[in-house]
Design a protein with these regions (language model features):
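Residue-level detector of extended alpha-helical repeat arrays and alpha-solenoid scaffolds
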Residues: 2-3, 30, 61, 94, ...
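Interface amphipathic segments
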Residues: 58, 62-63, 77-78, 94, ...
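Alpha-helical, heptad-rich or low-complexity scaffold/stalk segments
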Residues: 83, 103, 338, 409, ...
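Beta-propeller blade termini and top-face loops
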Residues: 4, 8-9, 14-17, 27-32, ...
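Core register positions within helices of long alpha-helical scaffolds
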Residues: 5-9, 36-40, 67-70, 100-107, ...
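Short inter-helical turns and helix N-cap capping residues of alpha-solenoid HEAT/ARM repeat scaffolds
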Residues: 1, 26-28, 56-57, 88-90, ...
Length: 477
């Protein structure tokens, strides 16, 4: 009953005096009482807890350390410091003393004992090489001293432990100002640890440090790959015209892929610059084609079409690949003329572009848009992939006309890509009557049955029917 009463008082407002009286009388195990002190943040119990620590077992120690970390003061500092040091600042679940010591320091900062806590944290920086402990100590110093802690942040950047360096940069974000940015930029100019430079560049990018964009751009030309890529990535995050021009220029470099990624996630508008890049040197043009396509830049459509006839093979290849991202329904006429003249490797790219061109339209409208070109074509199979995407009954009928006519394999290749439940019966009939395509038809048949809205009984019947004609073990399984 005493433990129930203690727990109740711990969660009852205005019960501090009553709880303290029960603690003094030790009406329950010390471990439970210490837990209640922590919940209640009962500062007046600190002397009692410190006295109990002298002969406490491990579970009670853990409860007391926890309570002191929450409601303790500088009076508890020496005790927890010694205990944490004895534990070699390890995370020991039995007592949790290291975590409690670090939490006590933060509690002291909140309770106007920041100067004492900061001094203890500075001592801790020297006492251990554990990155996670030193990071927590640095956090205390920054919270206690604010911008006066900059020297400790800069010192952390000279440390050999990257985890600690990165953590120091992260912790500095609440006090970061132009003075800190300038000091970090000086480090970028030094010839010391290259990984430190990469860390700073990554941090500049994450925090959008516009004032240091020149320092970032300078490092884009670094001989060290990690530094160069970090600078390129940071420039994309920071944004701005200067960064944009530098990234466009990097499209013609060994780090073109990194520059492309940075531009795709660029912090700002880039379409006008990409349009200019489409008129630049070949390497930049090719990269710009990819960017224009990925960003679905319909303003680039004419330039992409013009580059389809470029005398440079790699530019033509990039232009055909880019088509799919820059076309819309109004471009189907041009695409039709293009595919009707094409007899080689570019047909799949043009077909993909045609599918994307009509994709924004409803299924019936897709069919209505493409069927005039099918009807007047000498090779209607060129349009089957577009009809398959539409997938409405009229499209299925049109493709089946080719399957039963002069375009059997071309039509079948599109039929198995139609996402329409009506294809279940069509594919079954093909599996029964077309030995060449039977297995592929059954594979698609079972896939459509599986994702259909049919009842379990109806699905069983459809599977059973397929098994009766299946000869492929994989289909049977």
């Amino acid at each position: 009953l005493a433990e129930w009463a203690i727990n109740g008082l711990a969660h009852t407002e205005g019960a501090n005096e009553a709880l303290l009286d029960l603690i003094k009388k030790e009406v329950a195990p010390r471990e439970k009482l210490a837990y209640a002190v922590g919940v209640k943040r009962l500062k007046t119990a600190e002397p009692i807890l410190l006295e109990w620590l002298k002969n406490a077992d491990a579970p009670t120690q853990k409860a007391i350390y926890h309570a002191l970390s929450i409601c303790g003061s500088s009076a508890s500092l020496s005790t927890l410091e010694k205990a944490a040091k004895a534990a070699k600042y390890e995370w020991i679940p039995e007592t949790d003393v290291t975590a409690c010591y670090l939490r006590l320091l933060k509690t002291m900062v909140v309770n106007d004992e920041g100067h004492i806590a900061a001094n203890a944290a500075k001592k801790l920086l020297k006492d251990t090489d554990k990155a996670y402990v030193r990071g927590a100590a640095l956090d205390v110093i920054i919270e206690a001293e604010g911008k006066k802690a900059v020297s400790y942040i800069l010192a952390a950047l000279k440390d050999s432990n990257r985890e600690y360096r990165v953590n120091a940069l992260r912790l500095s974000e609440n006090i970061a100002d132009e003075t800190l940015y300038a000091n970090l930029a000086k480090t970028l100019k030094a010839k010391n640890n290259k990984k430190v430079k990469a860390d700073i560049l990554n941090w500049f990018g994450t925090n959008h440090v516009v004032s240091q964009i020149d320092a970032v751009i300078t490092n884009m030309d670094s001989d060290d790959e990690e530094i160069a890529i970090a600078a390129i990535t940071a420039a994309g995050k920071i944004g701005g015209d200067t960064a944009l021009e530098a990234l466009i220029a990097k499209l013609n470099s060994n780090h073109a892929d990194a520059a492309t990624k940075a531009l795709l996630s660029f912090n700002g508008k880039i379409n006008n610059n990409i349009m200019k890049a489409l008129d630049a040197d070949k390497a930049i043009r090719i990269a710009a084609l990819n960017l224009a396509s990925t960003r679905s830049m319909d303003e680039a459509t004419d330039k992409v079409f013009n580059m389809l006839t470029s005398p440079e093979n790699d530019v033509r290849t990039a232009a055909y690949k880019a088509l799919e991202g820059v076309v819309g329904p109004s471009d189907l006429e041009r695409l039709s003329r293009l595919i009707e003249k094409e007899s080689g490797k570019n047909i799949p790219q043009i077909q993909k572009a045609m599918r994307n061109a009509v994709l924004p339209l409803p299924k019936d409208k897709q069919y209505a848009t493409v069927i005039p070109y099918v009807n007047k074509s000498c090779n209607p199979s060129l349009y089957y992939p577009v009809l398959a995407q539409a997938g409405n009954p009229e499209s299925i009928a049109e493709i089946l006309k080719g399957y039963n006519g002069n375009y059997k394999q071309e039509a079948f290749a599109s039929l198995v890509n139609i996402d329409n439940i009506k294809m279940i019966e069509v594919l079954y009939n093909i599996a029964v009557n077309d030995k060449t395509n039977a297995q592929a038809a059954l594979n698609r048949y079972t896939s459509l049955v599986a994702k259909s809205a049919h009842t379990s009984i109806r699905k069983y019947q459809l599977y059973r029917r397929a098994l009766e004609i299946a000869s492929d073990v994989k289909v049977q399984n």
